[in-house]
C-alpha cells in the first residue's frame, strides 16, 4: 500500500503543487476511508472534498494502482475521466496528463470526452460532432470529423 500512496502523492504534486497529500488508508471490518491533507487541513476522507477534487484524487489513485500492478500497459483508455472536473481542473489535467503518462511509462492514451475545453494541441482528434464555427473544436490535429 505504501508504494501506491507514494506514487499517488507524487502525481498529486504535479496536479496540485503539493497542496494535497494522501494519508495511509483506514481499512478495517467496518470502514474504508482515504484521509487527505489539503491546505493545512486533514480531511477524514476524500468523500468530504469537492467533486472535482474527488475526481482528481480518484483518478490519481487509479493510475497508481495500475502502475503498481504486475501487468504494464503501453496504452490506456480514459473514458469521460474529465467529467467530474470543473473547467480549471479540466484544462490543467490535460496539461499534466503527458507528465503522468511519462512517469507511468505509458506511450499512448485514448481519451473520450464531451468537453471542448481540453488543451489538445498535441493530440490527434476524432470529432463526432463538429462545429466549424466553434474555435474550441478547431485545435489540435483533427484527423477525422463528422
Language-model features: locations:
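Interfacial catalytic loop of ABC nucleotide-binding domains
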Residues: 41-45
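Walker B catalytic motif
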Residues: 73-81, 85-89
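Conserved catalytic network of the ASCE P-loop NTPase/AAA+ motor domain
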Residues: 15, 49-51, 66-71, 99-105, ...
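GG-anchored amphipathic helix commonly corresponding to the ABC/SMC/Rad50 NBD signature/C-loop
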Residues: 51-77, 96
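C-terminal lobe/lid and adjacent interdomain/linker elements of RecA-like ASCE P-loop ATPase modules
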Residues: 91-146
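Flexible glycine-/small-residue-rich
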Residues: 24, 36-40, 51, 61, ...
Amino acid at each position: 500500500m505504501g508504494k501506491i500512496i507514494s506514487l499517488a502523492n507524487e502525481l498529486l504534486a504535479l496536479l496540485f503543487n503539493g497542496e494535497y497529500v494522501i494519508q495511509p488508508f483506514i481499512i478495517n471490518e467496518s470502514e474504508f476511508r482515504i484521509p487527505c491533507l489539503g491546505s493545512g487541513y486533514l480531511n477524514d476522507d476524500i468523500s468530504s472534498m469537492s467533486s472535482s477534487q474527488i475526481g482528481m484524487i480518484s483518478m490519481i489513485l487509479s493510475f497508481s494502482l495500475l502502475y503498481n500492478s504486475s501487468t504494464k500497459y503501453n496504452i490506456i483508455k480514459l473514458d469521460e475521466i474529465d467529467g467530474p472536473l470543473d473547467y480549471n481542473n479540466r484544462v490543467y489535467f490535460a496539461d499534466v496528463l503527458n507528465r503522468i503518462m511519462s512517469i507511468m511509462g505509458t506511450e499512448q492514451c485514448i481519451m473520450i470526452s464531451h468537453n471542448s475545453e481540453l488543451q489538445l494541441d498535441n493530440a490527434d482528434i476524432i470529432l463526432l460532432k463538429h462545429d466549424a464555427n466553434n474555435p474550441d473544436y478547431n485545435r489540435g490535429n483533427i484527423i477525422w470529423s463528422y
